[in-house]
Design a protein with these regions (language model features):
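Sequence-specific dsDNA recognition surfaces
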Residues: 6-60
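A short glycine-rich beta-alpha junction/loop motif
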Residues: 1, 83-89, 120-153
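Non-catalytic DNA-recognition/assembly elements of restriction-modification systems
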Residues: 1-21, 138-176
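A short beta-sheet element
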Residues: 54-56, 63-109
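Short, positively charged
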Residues: 100-133
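Active-site donor-binding loop signature of nucleotide-sugar glycosyltransferases
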Residues: 32, 93, 137
Length: 176
């Protein structure tokens, strides 16, 4: 018996809850520009939107993916609650599924290749939300999902720590 697959929509959904801009701090605001390319997480946004608006309300453990130029592979596993701009897709694991496994599934290059196959537009391509939710992922038990997700998240944490160490070493070398 081979590995069974399911569609992304079976384990996750797009968050549509809204939060007023005035309830979001700059440090908790995520836009496509504050998501870093090549799966490097996020930085603090430059500024909040100039006009009052409702943002997508994300929570700790949600997975945020930039939907403009998906080939840039901008993704972040939220470590806080906040608001996201309309061009950021916010995924949340359904009950009975692991948010860490959801992140691990969307972290794969094959996910971005799949999104690009269904893109809309050429200069500023965007992913097709309906097509994205049909992305195939392994169908696993919650314990298997959690195990895989936690391992991948642990690797990502270590990579980020090493990246910060390298950045500090580079800054120190420039001072010599």
């Amino acid at each position: 018996m081979g590995l069974q697959l399911c569609q992304l929509c079976e384990i996750a959904y797009f968050v549509t809850d809204k939060i007023p801009l005035e309830n979001v701090l700059l440090t908790d605001y995520v836009t496509t520009d504050s998501l870093l390319p090549n799966k490097e997480g996020r930085c603090v946004a430059q500024n909040l939107p100039p006009q009052k608006c409702a943002l997508t309300h994300f929570k700790c453990g949600d997975v945020l993916v930039a939907n403009i130029r998906p080939y840039l592979k901008k993704i972040w596993f939220a470590d806080r609650e906040g608001g996201a701009s309309a061009d950021v897709l916010v995924f949340r694991a359904k009950s009975g599924h692991s948010q860490e496994f959801l992140y691990a599934s969307l972290l794969q290059d094959s996910f971005y290749d799949y999104v690009m196959k269904g893109k809309k537009g050429s200069k500023m391509p965007r992913g097709d939300k309906a097509q994205i939710m049909r992305y195939s992922i392994p169908k696993l038990s919650l314990s298997e999902e959690a195990c895989i997700g936690n391992i991948i998240l642990s690797f990502c944490t270590k990579i980020n720590v090493n990246r910060r160490i390298n950045d500090n070493l580079e800054a120190m070398a420039k001072q010599l």
